[in-house]
Amino acid sequence: MTIIGSMRRIDDTRGAVRVEDLYDTDIEDLWRACTEPERLARWIGEVAGDLRPGGIVRSSWTSGWSGPARIDACEPPRHLRLTSDPGTDGETQIEAWLTPEGERTRLVVEERGLPVAELPAHGAGWQAHLEDLARSLVGLPSLWEDRWNELIAAYQDADVA
């Protein structure tokens, strides 16, 4: 099982998951897939609300997570940073960077502030989401749950740096 993510400790109790993949589309199209509600619904879930820096959105993801997120930075078409569950003990930062590589685009997503014990579940989840993003670009449906179930053991066996 190939994993495209890594996990690392930030401190004794919190950590980060980082996943990246290369997509057969240009940076503008991938940016739209990562920021437009109708495109997000095809691969990660429903998002609605104030879609501007400082705005709060409500999300309901295919992974089962549901809650608010604040848009902290939005620099089209290269960088997006959100704080999920802002102001709570479950607060995390989700950051995405897009980089063109020829006619393709690399997407790197990092979520920071996760409980260390939950890193494997989030690593498998983010990989399944990024694979669903690739599927959505060619009109295929999400396979999130099946892929998460296939990936979780590999992430549980992976080292946390």
Predicted regions and their residues:
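Terminal "cap-and-tail" regions of soluble proteins that handle hydrophobic small molecules
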Residues: 1-11, 102-106, 111-161
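Hydrophobic ligand-binding cavity/cleft-lining segments
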Residues: 1-47
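Alpha-helix N-cap/helix-start and coil->helix boundary motif
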Residues: 24, 37, 50-51, 65, ...
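Residues at secondary-structure transition points
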Residues: 25, 89, 117-120
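Hydrophobic-ligand binding "helix-grip"
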Residues: 41, 45-53, 58-115
